[in-house]
Amino acid sequence: MNLKIIYEDGNLLVVDKPAGIDIEGIKSALPEGSFPAHRLDKDTSGALLVAKNQETLDFLQKQFQERRVDKKYVCLVEGNIPDKGGTIETLVGRAKGDKRKQKVYLAGEPGSGRDAKTEYRVLERFKARLPDGQDYTLLEVSPKTGRKHQIRAHMTYLGHPVVGDKLYGFKNQKVPTGLKRQFLHAAYLKVSTPDGNTKEFISALPQDLILCLQQLKNS
């Protein structure tokens, strides 16, 4: 597997992770001695930080733990979000009865949730032209914590699941023709690097997601 390289120096590698490949698959394609500094879901594409040595890995992971990494995703969700943006703050933890999923817990609700905060901003709205059509909203999403499946669980909690999400999406969801996976892309990272600088990394939308948006605009 040939991974597209967004950035590389002596300590750090930023790759453009394709959808459909989990982190273990990515590891097998990395240079020997390199380690992903964080995770992206199998069907999520986008910028992935990779440390070339243990010292850099520790340096990067500490920033994630201290919530100092600025992360922005682009996602398409079901329905029309009328507001310009908002913040979702809940607890998120493992769902009882399904080890694959995370569940949103409210304050005082029995469970083992941990604090989770997600900010979102509307980029574009797609109104259905037919009476039985589906509205969609394109969002820029910034998770301020790093819980497993946080964006996906929070969007479903909001009532607007990520389009194409087979685990958190509503039953009988309408998916744009040709979209084969969830519309969730890690588009931006801002992080301090071991050389003392702060760097920003951008991953452009992949072709399958671009085609999906073009279809919605033209339909």
Task: Give short role names for the model-derived ranges.
Residues 1-219:
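RNA pseudouridine synthases
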